[in-house]
Amino acid sequence: MAKTIAYDEEARRGLERGLNALADAVKVTLGPKGRNVVLEKKWGAPTITNDGVSIAKEIELEDPYEKIGAELVKEVAKKTDDVAGDGTTTATVLAQALVREGLRNVAAGANPLGLKRGIEKAVEKVTETLLKSAKEVETKDQIAATAAISAGDQSIGDLIAEAMDKVGNEGVITVEESNTFGLQLELTEGMRFDKGYISGYFVTDAERQEAVLEDPFILLVSSKVSTVKDLLPLLEKVIQAGKPLLIIAEDVEGEALSTLVVNKIRGTFKSVAVKAPGFGDRRKAMLQDMAILTGGQVISEEVGLSLESADISLLGKARKVVVTKDETTIVEGAGDSDAIAGRVAQIRTEIENSDSDYDREKLQERLAKLAGGVAVIKAGAATEVELKERKHRIEDAVRNAKAAVEEGIVAGGGVALLHAIPALDELKLEGEEATGANIVRVALEAPLKQIAFNGGLEPGVVAEKVRNSPAGTGLNAATGEYEDLLKAGIADPVKVTRSALQNAASIAGLFLTTEAVVADKPEKAAAPAGDPTGGMGGMDF
């Protein structure tokens, strides 16, 4: 395919137009008075959301250079969402401000590499300042406040805090759709481990990139599964039972994997293959934990069991299994409660008798997985559109609360970034690096200014007032008052704020140092078929 090439200022401005198109759509959602964005779907009802990454993913631009610019800033939102679970809109606003200021300096003749180095040093300093000023999350109320800000709903924040209180900070919290109105919290036996599906073809929900199995059988194998003849007798029995199958093995490869994938694509049989977590003896122990939790047995030659002679009675069961690309959650395994309690007691004894800190840590992880359970938040709403939007908000808020527990919290509302600006004076940079640091200085005000603008206030006036206020004091955009934001319960996890800034700076550096852009040449649309005599094509007279 033919390519089109743009150089120098033309290339950078093309990328910036794409970035601005995406950022302008995303930034209207920032803050408590931010608006929603409606996303058209090819099938089904439209989605209404105020989540930055969901909006960013939907934007496809026609101009090839603008398209690349939008894709680059999409990456900022995606990366921030992956790392911290929130802050995608803040990251987009920061990226736009950094690129706008940076390109102005490049156009005036500044060296892009010097600017990039200055930006990197300034971001490192601000990150260090944010981490130093972070307050540890100690109370249930602090968790509730942080989650409530992310979800824009205090009742959601309270429920998430209660869920974390029940299952612990490392516990698993899942969100499900409910047929009733309102929110409910249920505690179930369950486990989550850090291994996802082996092949993307197993996905059942393309939008969320998840494989969801309801009431599945669970096959646990301690070795590799590669030949289909070993698996076939058992597969036939499972198909007859009419249930999906989750396979957890050392690995699933070759014809065994292709058989499962082909049957899934054809709709003949729903299954998911996942690698077992851990290595060596720890893998065996974790497989045994899963067997006890699900009421199954591990198929292993060590205990005289082989895959080709395995019966359906050796399979475990669960109410539901959710598999993403990175992790697997088993909800409500069908294991005997006495057997689970016995296994928990055994692991506790091993922890007491262990001399190694590493072994003790890994045993604690196993104990948390087995004993912690899974908190299920069931969300209901009047319409399907509202339900999807609400479910998404709750999932974001759960990740936000976990990030807060992990690294602590700072004042929200863009105030922590603005109050970190004086730390840049300590850098003592010169020349273009100092200009790079000044670009960051200007950009750090952007989130607060956007929150003020969305709240119908004058951004410059608000920024000036907050700049001259004591640390942690800022605008509560919901009420229009200036107050101590942490006391008012307006806090952001420092992990979210830090990730947003680091990812925005990373992309801004790439924008500034770009000197040429190579893109696919847009194809001209073919003329519609017509009658060579001049009549209308496709008509019978």
UniProtKB/Swiss-Prot annotation:
UniProt GO BP: protein refolding
First-level EC class: isomerase
Range of residues in the leader sequence: none
UniProt key word Cell wall biogenesis/degradation: no
Coiled-coil parts of chain: none
Matching Gene3D superfamilies: GroEL, GroEL-like equatorial domain, TCP-1-like chaperonin intermediate domain
The protein's role, per its UniProt record: Together with its co-chaperonin GroES, plays an essential role in assisting protein folding. The GroEL-GroES system forms a nano-cage that allows encapsulation of the non-native substrate proteins and provides a physical environment optimized to promote and accelerate protein folding.
Listed GO CC annotations: capsule; cell surface; cytoplasm; extracellular region
A molecular function (GO) term: unfolded protein binding
Effect of residue 481 to K: In strain: Linda
PROSITE patterns: CHAPERONINS_CPN60 (PS00296)
Binding site for ATP: 29-32, 86-90, 413, 476-478, 492
Oligomer and partners: Forms a cylinder of 14 subunits composed of two heptameric rings stacked back-to-back. Interacts with the co-chaperonin GroES.
Reaction catalyzed: ATP + H2O + a folded polypeptide = ADP + phosphate + an unfolded polypeptide
Superkingdom as given in the UniProt entry: Bacteria
Keywords: ATP-binding, Cell wall, Chaperone, Isomerase, Nucleotide-binding, Secreted
Name this protein carries in UniProt: Chaperonin GroEL 2
Localisation per UniProt entry: Secreted, Capsule; Cell surface; Secreted, Cell wall
Family from the record: Belongs to the chaperonin (HSP60) family.
EC number, UniProt record: 5.6.1.7
Effect of residue 525 to T: In strain: Linda
Highest classification ranks of the organism: Bacteria, Bacillati, Actinomycetota, Actinomycetes, Mycobacteriales
